[in-house]
Amino acid sequence: MEGANGKQQKHFVLVHGAGHGAWCWYKLKPLLESSGHKVTAIDLVASGINAKRLDEVDTLHEYSLPLLELMAAIPPGEKVILVGHSFGGFSTAIAMEHYPEKISIAVFIASVMPDAVNPPSYFFNLVFEWSPKDEDPLDTKIEEYGSPDQPRTAIRYGPKYLSSKVYQNCTSEEIELANLLLRPISLFAEDLSKAKAFSAEGYGSVKRAYIICNEDKSFPVGFQHWLVENVGVIESKVIKGADHMAMISKPQQLRQCLQEIADKVV
């Protein structure tokens, strides 16, 4: 099917990062749709307007179920462009592992991007190794939840951290929106520590592209370049002036990058 601009219509599936939800794509979604594409933005479990609480989800697989259910419902023969942001890269990878035949390419935006050799925990730990050792968490809070038998740790980003490390190139109104809508997050560290490497036949068989945000202060820019060089992609882009939230601070540039990737490899 052709889109409004005469080009082949694509179906983009947008996967948000930790603490966020489908709402964070509110600028990008209509831009892609105005080019004639179909766009689906999902809420992962305990995110956005998903009704479940964080203490009701124990594993990364459970957290990713809305994405997996969406992928399962895609008719045979149809393919999507899967777009994962930040921590959403892990959920994206899980979908690639289970439904490689339904994904034409996976695009990682300032995101963790595993390979088909090392376990996910390897890349989870690398994020912290690449981060500044003396980084000030500012008003970010660590909260305990769960039971004495199964203690869990949640992270709640504070307004100062968001405005200076995550949304620093966004407007005050956009930062306020995030403050109002962001939910506590779990990084599922215990679950990730037990997970095996993704397979070459599943995850590894899907084409990958990467978009680097060159003014990112929360997901190390150097690590983003390292992932491109060491994990490997068939296409990479750099968005100049983009903070971690490129879909909000640089939506037009992000749309252009996604369009170029789709045109080239799909």
Curated annotation (Swiss-Prot):
It catalyses: 17-dehydropreakuammicine + H2O = norfluorocurarine + methanol + CO2. Pathway: Alkaloid biosynthesis. Residues 11-121 form the AB hydrolase-1 domain. Keywords: Alkaloid metabolism, Hydrolase, Serine esterase. Homodimer. Hydrolase involved in the biosynthesis of curare monoterpene indole alkaloids (MIAs), natural products such as diaboline, a pharmacologically active compound used to regulate blood pressure. Curare alkaloids act as animal glycine receptor antagonists. Catalyzes the conversion of dehydropreakuammicine to norfluorocurarine. This is Norfluorocurarine synthase 1. The lineage of its organism: Eukaryota, Viridiplantae, Streptophyta, Embryophyta, Tracheophyta. The gene is NS1.
